[in-house]
């Protein structure tokens, strides 16, 4: 007679790439919280209206909180959420080309005001508005641009190697 192999519980990992904190939580299938960790990534304001943070530091903090909650656990699914718009401009190797820009950033406001023809008014913190600014203000870096990612999608790409987003973020990119 062969005894069944013991199975480990199937667990779920939630990862929130927020604008102030990065949080990871592990749940069991009944919704009980088994582990929770959080970390902070400093935000920079190098000029009036600019709000940035280091995308590589964001990745390091995200990886650290995931390690803390998942160590010794069998994670079977991962869900990501993030802090709205903004943009992380990366090259083909997912290397950030500059500091990441948070959605509260206003540097592209002049571009938004110039485009009065739009039926849906964009706002300065949307990826589309930020792309216009990036191409005009940092053309050398913009020539190496391969992907414009939302914050959670940058972390997802680093976790999985897959560049993707969801319909809600894509529709709000501007």
Walk through the language-model features, giving the residues of each:
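N-terminal glycine/serine-rich phosphate-binding loop of ATP-dependent small-molecule kinases
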Residues: 1-99, 144
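Gly/Ser/Thr-rich active-site cleft segment
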Residues: 17-19, 118-174
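Carbohydrate-associated surface elements
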Residues: 105
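Pocket-flanking alpha-helical
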Residues: 110-114
């Amino acid at each position: 007679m062969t005894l069944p192999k013991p199975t480990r519980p199937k667990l779920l990992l939630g990862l929130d790439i927020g604008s102030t904190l990065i949080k990871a939580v592990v749940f069991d299938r009944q919704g009980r919280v088994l582990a929770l960790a959080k970390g902070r990534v400093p935000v920079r304001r190098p000029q009036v209206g600019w709000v940035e943070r280091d995308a590589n530091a964001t990745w390091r903090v995200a990886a650290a909180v995931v390690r803390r909650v998942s160590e010794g656990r069998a994670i079977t699914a991962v869900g990501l959420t993030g802090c709205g718009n903004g943009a992380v401009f990366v090259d083909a190797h997912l290397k950030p080309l500059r500091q990441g820009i948070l959605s509260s950033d206003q540097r592209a406001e002049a571009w938004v005001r110039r485009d009065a023809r739009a039926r849906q008014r964009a706002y300065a913190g949307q990826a589309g508005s930020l792309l216009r600014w990036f191409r005009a203000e940092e053309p050398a870096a913009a020539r190496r641009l391969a992907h414009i990612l939302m914050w959670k999608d940058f972390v997802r790409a680093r976790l999985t190697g897959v560049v993707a987003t969801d319909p809600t973020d894509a529709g709000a990119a501007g």
